[in-house]
Amino acid sequence: MAKPTTVKIRLVSTADTGFFYVTKKNPRNTTEKMTFRKYDPVVRKHVEFKEAKIK
């Protein structure tokens, strides 16, 4: 089988709550780090989430 083109990444909350989302990204098309504004249920607000490696 061929190697998959997408890799799994973590989107970690910048509110330092430890909450994260897991999503996929194609590193050939999206070379820079992803940032999204998503909901953090720990602080109950929308905050910025930044890309981090899955350990």
Swiss-Prot record:
Belongs to the bacterial ribosomal protein bL33 family. It comes from the Bacteria. Keywords: Ribonucleoprotein, Ribosomal protein. PANTHER family: 54S RIBOSOMAL PROTEIN L39, MITOCHONDRIAL, LARGE RIBOSOMAL SUBUNIT PROTEIN BL33M. GO terms for biological process: translation. This is Large ribosomal subunit protein bL33. GO terms for cellular component: cytosolic large ribosomal subunit. Signal peptide: none annotated. Pfam families: Ribosomal_L33 (PF00471). One of its GO terms (molecular function) is structural constituent of ribosome. InterPro entries: Ribosomal_bL33, Ribosomal_bL33_CS, Ribosomal_bL33_sf, Ribosomal_zn-bd.
